[in-house]
């Protein structure tokens, strides 16, 4: 089988699946937009950092930059899912944490800021935020790493990153402008 044939077969299989995925996502977003599915707000401002493309947009460095600026004036915390960690539930990063316990990116953030910034992981963002507020009632701001698609939490501010590629940028700019 030639590579072109394989590509055509994959195209015919994946295209209908992408339509299904897009339809389900559209219905889900409509349900959030019309308040059928609830968005939870918290007494602490939430900053959500996310991206439009898969991987490689620099979410963690941007999160670190945002946290570095905000931590100068606010008692700041970071909450992440802890991608590829081998643990479950809410875990607060500490000096004994490993990539297996909290994930490599949350550990990187913890090592950069140390005790100045609380860094935690939890696969359930709402539970993680509640736990962070409960354990540290003096927290003034929580930054959610990689949370743009997580609509159950209503952020005060969303920072959206994307790769720079002219066709994509052009489409978005024209759509926003017109």
Show where each model-derived region lies.
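P-loop NTP-binding module
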Residues: 18, 30, 46-51, 55, ...
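Proline-rich low-complexity regions
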Residues: 16, 45, 61, 106, ...
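Catalytic cores of large soluble enzymes that bind and process phosphate-bearing ligands
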Residues: 12, 19, 58, 101, ...
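A transmembrane-helix-recognition feature enriched in membrane-embedded lipid enzymes
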Residues: 1-45
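Phosphate/Mg2+-binding loops and adjacent switch elements
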Residues: 83-178
């Amino acid at each position: 089988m030639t590579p072109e044939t394989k590509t055509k077969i994959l195209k015919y299989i994946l295209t209908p699946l992408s339509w299904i995925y897009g339809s389900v996502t559209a219905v889900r977003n409509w349900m959030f937009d019309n308040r059928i599915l609830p968005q939870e707000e918290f007494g602490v401002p939430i900053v959500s950092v996310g991206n439009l493309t898969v991987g490689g947009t620099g979410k963690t460095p941007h999160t670190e930059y945002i946290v570095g600026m905000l931590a100068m004036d606010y008692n700041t915390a970071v909450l992440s899912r802890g991608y590829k960690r081998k643990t479950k539930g809410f875990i607060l990063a500490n000096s004994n944490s490993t990539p297996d316990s909290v994930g490599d990116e949350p550990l990187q953030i913890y090592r950069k800021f140390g005790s100045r910034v609380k860094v935690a992981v939890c696969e359930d963002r709402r539970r993680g935020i509640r736990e962070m507020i409960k354990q540290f009632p003096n927290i003034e701001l929580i930054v959610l790493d990689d949370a743009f698609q997580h609509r159950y939490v209503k952020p005060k501010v969303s920072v959206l990153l994307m790769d720079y590629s002219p066709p994509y940028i052009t489409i978005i700019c024209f759509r926003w402008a017109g």
